[in-house]
Amino acid sequence: MLKSILIFLVLNAPAQANLGSYKDGRLINPNTNQPYTGNIDIINEDWGKDAVEFNKDYVDGVLHGTEKSYYQSGKLKSLGSFKRGILDGIVTGYYEDGTIQVRATYDNGVKQGRVIRYYPNGTKQVESFYTDDKFDGVRTTWYENGKPI
């Protein structure tokens, strides 16, 4: 069964208003019929009434700023940055206990530089290098005890 996800607009006021739809690739605020600027919590009702699955920043209806995803427990699952709707900057994925699972860098939507995956115990698992979204160079792997493979 598909998750029923409702999008809510986070306002400074205590109430939350239901967000509208996308028009020409921009998120439209149904209260003003204009592209939305601000922070949004996306609620997963299957998890509970106020269970946030995503938190996103928008400017002029386009993702711009931080995007966070959460586990059902409420703990941070991933953190990334967007510029004008395109992934840009460091993206970090986390295990539910908060340990880093993966870290990568994007430049204008393209994977660039070092990508590191970690075991749940925090030890490096794989380190790879990318140029223009393609593997480039040496890939190093480790056993969970930290010894190189």
Q: What are these model-predicted stretches?
A:
Residues 3-13:
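Sec-dependent N-terminal signal peptides
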Residues 11-149:
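Glycine/tyrosine- and acidic-biased, solvent-exposed loop/turn segments at the edges of beta-strands
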